[in-house]
């Protein structure tokens, strides 16, 4: 039985090659787990997740090994892309499409069979019913985020990559998302970034801290780590 969803070794990412933004990074996402990535704004969280999401040209990164579901891969292979789906904290793609067109397009790409019950549960849970035919570019930040979150949890790929998933969501949507995150471990794994320590503690099994492009596993119990962080803040 495979125990690893994603295993990355020796990842470096740069915008200018002499100034790496992500530095010699190793990352493990076990199967059926939620892994957190916490750091201040500008620490490199989004850059790391963009690399893992096939955004960067191969000339902008170097990596020793990439393994997903026990198979060697690279970020740009169709197999790797088919096993992941990313929700970025800001997404300016498909702005002239509405949810229905975007959703149907992505489902065809992922060869996802129709499940109307699941789709309606997600739309209702995020209170998105009245925005299904609104252009994505016309939506508020929170509702725009819901387009991609609904799609993510409908597709159910082995690995969801979520960049600051709670940003822009109201209280009800936030609580609904917490429930989805905890349930998802039955389906697959999640790697999520946050600058909010409470969200990491609430849903994550393990976590990494990132600072100045360096990734470090948090070895202690996450609740103990959270209390230590609060004590240091005074």
Segments (PLM) and residue ranges:
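A short, flexible loop at the N-terminus of ABC-type nucleotide-binding domains that lies
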Residues: 1-24, 60
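The feature captures the beta-strand-to-loop junction immediately N-terminal to the Walker
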Residues: 38-40
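Helix-to-loop junction immediately C-terminal to a conserved catalytic motif
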Residues: 53
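Conserved ABC transporter NBD signature motif
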Residues: 61-80
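Q-loop/switch helix immediately C-terminal to the Walker
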Residues: 90, 95-110
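Conserved ABC ATPase "signature" region
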Residues: 104, 114-131
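Catalytic Walker B motif of ABC-type/P-loop ATPase nucleotide-binding domains
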Residues: 160-164
């Amino acid at each position: 039985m495979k125990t690893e969803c994603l295993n990355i070794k020796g990842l470096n990412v740069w915008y200018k090659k002499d100034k790496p933004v992500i530095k010699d990074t190793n990352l493990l996402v076990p199967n059926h787990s939620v892994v957190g990535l916490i750091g201040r704004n500008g620490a490199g969280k989004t850059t790391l997740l963009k690399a893992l999401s096939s955004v960067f040209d191969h000339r902008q990164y170097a990596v020793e090994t990439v393994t997903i579901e026990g198979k060697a891969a690279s970020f740009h292979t169709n197999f790797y892309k088919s096993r992941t789906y990313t929700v970025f904290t800001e997404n300016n793609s498909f702005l002239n499409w509405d949810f229905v067109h975007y959703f149907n397009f992505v489902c065809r790409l992922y060869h996802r069979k129709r499940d109307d019950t699941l789709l309606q549960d997600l739309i209702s849970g995020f209170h998105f019913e009245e925005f299904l035919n609104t252009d994505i570019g016309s939506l508020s930040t929170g509702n725009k985020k819901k387009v991609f979150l609904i799609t993510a949890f409908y597709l159910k790929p082995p690995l969801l990559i979520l960049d600051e998933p709670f940003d822009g969501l109201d209280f009800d949507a936030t609580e609904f998302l917490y429930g989805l995150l905890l349930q998802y471990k039955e389906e697959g794994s999640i790697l999520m970034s946050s600058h909010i320590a409470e969200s990491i503690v609430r849903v994550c099994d393990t976590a990494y801290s990132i600072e100045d492009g360096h990734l470090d596993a948090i070895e202690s119990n996450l609740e103990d780590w959270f209390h230590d962080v609060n004590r240091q803040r005074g």
